[in-house]
């Protein structure tokens, strides 16, 4: 069974590298890139969450709950040509990058769901 996704981190396919790739269409805007050795260098105080929750290609079941994420992040790293890059992302793009970034540190989205209050609201939802 093939499932569609919008991001994939190297550890999800058994590759022990700090890299991930994303292809996300948000309205008329398309974000498509791969990044090596990414680092979140700054983030907003404002948080957000996906109202419908998050899913993951590594998790074959639905996990209910809100995952707190930063509304805006600045991500630095190296592109596929070996050039340094810095991306300023907000909203859904920022959420997806944080999800993939977590995989690099062995963190799953459900690890961030508050077990005592799984549907806690963090700022405004997306």
Regions found by a protein language model. Give the residues of each.
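Positively charged
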Residues: 1-126
């Amino acid at each position: 069974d093939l499932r569609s996704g919008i991001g994939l981190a190297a550890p999800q396919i058994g590759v022990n590298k700090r890299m991930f790739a994303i292809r996300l269409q948000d309205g008329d805007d398309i974000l498509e890139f791969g990044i090596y050795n990414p680092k979140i260098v700054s983030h907003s105080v404002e948080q957000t969450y996906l109202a419908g929750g998050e899913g993951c290609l590594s998790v074959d079941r639905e996990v209910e709950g809100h995952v707190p994420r930063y509304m805006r992040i600045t991500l630095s790293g190296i592109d596929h040509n070996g050039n340094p890059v810095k991306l300023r992302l907000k909203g859904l793009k920022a959420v997806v990058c944080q999800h993939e970034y977590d995989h690099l540190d062995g963190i799953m989205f459900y690890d961030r769901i508050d077990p005592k209050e799984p549907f806690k609201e963090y700022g405004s939802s997306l």
